[in-house]
Amino acid sequence: MTLLPTQELYSEILPGLWQGGTHDFDTLEYPKQYPIWNQEKLFDSVATLYAVAHPVGWGISERRFGFPDSALDEENLPDIHAMADWVYEEWKSGKKVLVRCQAGWNRSGLVTALALMKDGQKAKDAIDLIRARRSPHALCNADFAAYLNSICE
C-alpha cells in the first residue's frame, strides 16, 4: 500500500483494537524477511483480509480470510462475521489486535466495525469512529457501509 503523506500503516481505533493496511513489499510476490523468534511483536493477534499479504511472524496468532474490496458477496458474509467474532474475542480478552487488509480502509473497516457493533456500538457510531481514527476514506466502499447500516448486531 502506498501511504498518504500523513497516514500511518496502523491506527488504534480503541485501546487494543487496531486497523491497518499491508506495506507494498509485504506481499507474496516479494521475499519475506521474517523477524527473529524473540523480537518484540507489535500485536498479539492479527486478522488478515488481504489474500496476498505475507503471513505474520513468530508467536503471533493470525486468522486469514481474503475477500475482494468490491460488491459484498453474500457467500462471504458467514466468514466475515466469524472473523469479526474472533477479533472481538481476542480484543476483549486483553490482546492487542490488528485487523488488516490492503489499504486499511474497507475490508479491515468492515470487520472492525462489526467487532465494534458486537461491543454495543451502532453502525453509524462505529463508522464515524473508524473514519476519525483511521482515515476519512475508511469504509468508502458504499456496499460495505450500506451493509453495516442495514444490520443490527
Question: What are these regions, as identified by a protein language model?
Answer:
Residues 94-113, 117:
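A phosphate-binding catalytic loop at a beta-strand-loop-alpha-helix junction
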